[in-house]
């Protein structure tokens, strides 16, 4: 009798687990940080709106360490607006690109441009920084060193103060720095080789040893600086700037301090005029100022002021109504104009221009307007107090 045929056992293969259909699966934080570090910081305000995790990563120290290691640090424009000098809460903004700057939009705009001649938007705006506990800036000295902005001195309850507040432009948080040796109100603050020199604004101008002091951010210490003498120092300083490592101080006399030599000298008359009462800035060791639609620069060799050539397409603005700043070797200019809305309400429109600079020979510097546009609208009572460009 034949043995029965053995039946083969069949086993069903388990059905494969369905793969995730999420178009953007989550990535490890270190990979996201590596990607973000390669993106211009002009896009960070927009990227921070994507999610809470993005917002957290954009404010993380790891991101900025990576940017530094990759050589991706860049100059970033920061603007402080204040409601006259009595406003206890100034508002801070940074220049960024609008969220809708995409390739599709650019192509669409180019097609529209062929149909009608209309000025295209530059895509730049001033984005508000959600920074808390900002001290008034109107009567303080403000400078940028590295990725920090220092708010130095100024009145506290209408009195002189030695307080130093530091805005970390990576995390957008304030912290207190070491206080000055002397209480000051509306001091001049300048940076030479990473050190901050603070001048004037003292209560007691008769004590010349108080006139200038210097802060070293690396050692976090203040030291006194030799004085030119109380008789020519004085309490008030109209303007100050740094050119070729020397501090120019425009007061009733006009002084120059040379930190490397530790000595003072009188400013030449031809340099003492012009820039003192107007909007000005220093870009790559050249002092510029604006007056009646013309930008001028000081030729230190010939000891005279020359016109900046080639700047076209900018509207005129008040000689003292604008603010100028070094923006990574270019010149950034802010000014305002009054606009009326449909309901008759008057506001202030803040405009900005970025000008590329080119020295063609020892006697000629040319400027080219890369873009200019309205970047913010604020209530009429606000004004631009400072424009600075820390490196972040």
From Swiss-Prot:
Protein name (database record): F-box/kelch-repeat protein At4g39550
Record field: compositional bias (Low complexity): 18-27
Domain of life of the organism encoding this protein: Eukaryota
Region span, Disordered: 1-27
Role noted for this protein: Component of SCF(ASK-cullin-F-box) E3 ubiquitin ligase complexes, which may mediate the ubiquitination and subsequent proteasomal degradation of target proteins.
Segments annotated as Kelch repeats: 148-194, 195-242, 244-285
Species this chain originates from: Arabidopsis thaliana
Record note on domains: The F-box is necessary for the interaction with ASK proteins.
Pfam families listed in its UniProt record: F-box (PF00646), Kelch_FKB95 (PF25210)
Annotated pathway: Protein modification; protein ubiquitination
Comp. bias (Basic residues): 1-12
Swiss-Prot/TrEMBL keywords: Kelch repeat, Repeat, Ubl conjugation pathway
Domain F-box: 21-67
Keyword Repeat: yes
